Each structure stands twice: as structure tokens, then as C-alpha cells.
Amino acid sequence: MAVDMELDGGGDGKGKAPPQISLSGLFLACMVAGGVQYGWALQLSLLTPYVQTLGIPHALTSVMWLCGPIAGLIVQPCVGLYSDKCTSSLGRRRPFILTGCIIICISVIVIGFSSDIGYALGDTTEDCKVYRGPRYHAAAAFILGFWLLDFSNNTVQGPARALMADLSGRHGPSAANAIFCSWMALGNILGYSSGSTNDWHKWFPFLMTRACCEACANLKAAFLVAVVFLGLSTAVTMVFAREVALDPVAAAKRNEGEASGLLAVFKGMKNLPVGMPSVLIVTGLTWLSWFPFILFDTDWMGREIYHGRPDGSPAEVTAFQEGVRQGAFGLLLNSIVLGISSFLIEPMCRRLGARAVWVMSSAVVCVAMAAVSVLSAWSLGDFGGSVQDAARAPAEEGGVRASALALFVFLGLPFAVLCSVPFAVTAQLAASRGGGQGLCTGVLNISIVVPQMAIALGAGPWDELFGEGNIPAFAMASVFAAAAAAAGVVLLPKVSVRSVSMAGGH
């Protein structure tokens, strides 16, 4: 059943209210989201295709992504809980943001130099221009960096969102989430621009080695730029996010007798705000519909649309890499629409209600995922529907490729809803009971990562049953999107117009 609610503002309830911050100050305080998202964009657009060049088969690439859900399941709720109680002089959120960003920098350097690490450990003595075999040491280094990156991303993301809710004040959580979403869009634009650029190796030729040819050097350079941008954005956030530290004595008294660690997280889940369980259910279904595309979008462009293979002939590899770059360009267009749309979400919620906006976005995703499946079948239709057959045939399908890019653009608005509305509703629900922004954000993340675990475990084997393509996963995503829309109509709380714009503190 839907729950009608009138939610008013309220701080976190765990100490002095933060000083009032201007909208421009709030914008600068959120800059770390852009830095983190830059690296995340590179991870999404390039790493699934790249790891296949190291010898990991397509069916196992989704399993590699298990690290994100596992990290989200363990790290974000715990970090959210401890950040609610942190008594550091830097404040509650900034210590976790700073630590996570340092680890992100280390992890992306490991990923960028994974081929060189594997070469040093004895993968091969041949030059990368002639060697086409597996490089398992490089793959191991890559996966280590990949997992470390996901754990550190989760360390930053929960406190960063909670920080925005803490500081939002009179601007409200919807405005804070719109700013967060706009920084994500900017990070995506920069990251996907880097991923779609094929000239990094020309600008930084010293990054090419016997183990690292052009594609590898492009990846390496893009991640080194990510380190610089993340360092800058973290510094700006640390300066402008002026938190008020918790009083250690008062915090100790308040925390006496409370459970700690994961026990506290599960204890907190028993006392969620009214309406939060429904939000968790709909969020889970929504992410089941999105994660196949997030995981395989550039791989889909390389395989189904450009008919390439990461482990095929030189011509097939070239076609695959071109498809991946075009997929990154599609994600760039998607991010531009995301950035524009992020400023439309609050007016839409004010006019239609958060529930209606969320439900309509799920309906759009349902149509889009069905269109992806149809477009893929159309692209492969002349080759018997087989990715392997299509990879050996010439591909001159300008209409199909243009339609594929159009789908990336079409998904920009619902992705803006995904990045904003669930978190804004969660912040309002937390404010309605006087605090716990960090814990509620962490618990919401559980409803995101559990579907991701299901997709990560099942998508690769499921697709392999149908010829190693991505069509079955996208078709199933359309079904989940329809279920999310139906569940949203029945279950989501009806948040008042006033609460959308004003909830979140005074």
C-alpha cells in the first residue's frame, strides 16, 4: 500500500546544526562527487571490455563486478553508521571521504599499470603488438585494483551523499541531490570523453611499453588524469564542506549500550522510518532493470552493434575497440542529458510528485531495454542471430549504430531520476524521524547492491546460453523495469510537494 506522508525538515539530530551554507558553497562542497564519478565512468565504459583482452572470458566478466555489490553490502552501511557517530575534528563525513579518495587513487594506478605488472611477473616476453595470448598475472593485478576501487568508491559515496543532506539546510535534500547529480554528470562527461578518446598515447607516448600498446596506454593516461582531478575535487570539498564536529563526551553518552559494526546496522534496519521498506523494494527492482545495461553497454556496442570480438582477429579486435569507443561516446551523450535533467527533477517532483516521477522513469526504462533487445536482434539478423557469425561479417549498419547512440541519449532522463529521487526520498524519510542520514543511505545501498549481486552472478552464464551475446540480459531488464513501475504505483510513499523542496534541515 502507498503511504501518504507530510515530511518536514530536520537536521541529523546528532549535534549542533551545521552553519548555513549558500547554494554556491553547497555546490563546491559536493565537488568530490565529480572526481569520484570520473573514475567510475572510466570503470564502467572501459574495464569490462579491457579485462577480456587480458584473457578473462565474457561469461566471467560479470562475476568480476561482484566486488561492487559486496563492498556496498558491507562497506557503505558500516561507513554510514560510523560516520553518523564520528567525533573527528574534521567532522563526521570528511574523514571517510578523504580516506576513500586516497585509496581510489592507489587502485586506479594499479589498474592502469596492470599490463606492465603482469609483464614484470612473467606473463610473456613478447611485444604486445604481436602477443595475443592470455596474461593472467596482469588480469590478477587488474582485478585486485578493480576490487580495491569498488571498496573505496563505496567508502566515499555514502558519506558524500550524507554530507549533502547534512549541509542542505534551507535548500532542502532535493536541491542537494540535484547538485550531487550535476557533479556526477560532469564527472561522467569528463570520464566518458576520456574513454572515447583514442589519442592519449599520442599525447603521452612515454606511457607505451612492450607490455602496453596503444589501447592500454590510452587507459593508463585516462586513469592518471583521474588521479589529478580526484585530488583537486577532494581538496575543494574538504575546504568548503564546513562540518561541525560532534562533541566526544556527548556522543559517548548517547552511544552507550548501542550495538556496533554490522550488528548495529541490522539493528538500525529494524527501526527504519515508515515507508522506507517500500522504498527499498522498489529501489531493488529498479536496479535489476538498470544494472545489465550499466555492466554491458560498451561491450554491447562492440559485439552486437559493431560485430567485433576482443579475442578475435586483428580486424575483429579493431571493430570491437571502435564499438567500445562509440559506446563511451554514447555514455558521454547520456551524461550531458543527465546533467541537464538533474535540474528538472525537483520541478517535476514538485508538480507531479516523487512517486509519479519514479514510476514514469521505470516505464521509460522498460521501453528502452526492450528497444535495445530488438535493435540487437535487428543488427544480428542478417547473420543468423549469432555474435560469432556477425563478427566475421562486414558491418555497414549506419542506421543501427545511430539508433544505438540515440538510446544512450534517451536513457539520460531516467538515469537522472535513478541518481536523485530514491536518495532524496530517503533523506526526507530520515529527516522525518530526526536523524540517521548516514545509516538510511547505507541501508538504501543494500537494496541497490543485492540486485547487482544477482545480475553479476547470473548475467554472464545466462547470456552464454544464447551465444555469448548480451540480448537475454537486456530482455530480462525490460521485465524488471515493468515490475518496478507496477510496484512503485502500489508501494511508494506519496511525499508531499512541500516536503520535496524543503525537507532536510533548517
Curated annotation (Swiss-Prot):
Q: Cellular location of this protein?
A: Cell membrane
Pathway stated in the Swiss-Prot or TrEMBL entry: Glycan biosynthesis; sucrose metabolism
Q: Does the keyword Metal-binding apply?
A: no
What GO cellular component entries does it have? Answer: membrane; plasma membrane
| Pfam families in the record | MFS_2
Question: Any idea which UniProt keywords this protein has?
Answer: Cell membrane, Membrane, Sugar transport, Symport, Transmembrane, Transmembrane helix, Transport
Family listed:
Belongs to the glycoside-pentoside-hexuronide (GPH) cation symporter transporter (TC 2.A.2.4) family.
- What's the protein here called? Sucrose transport protein SUT3
Q: From which organism does this entry originate?
A: Oryza sativa subsp. japonica (Rice)
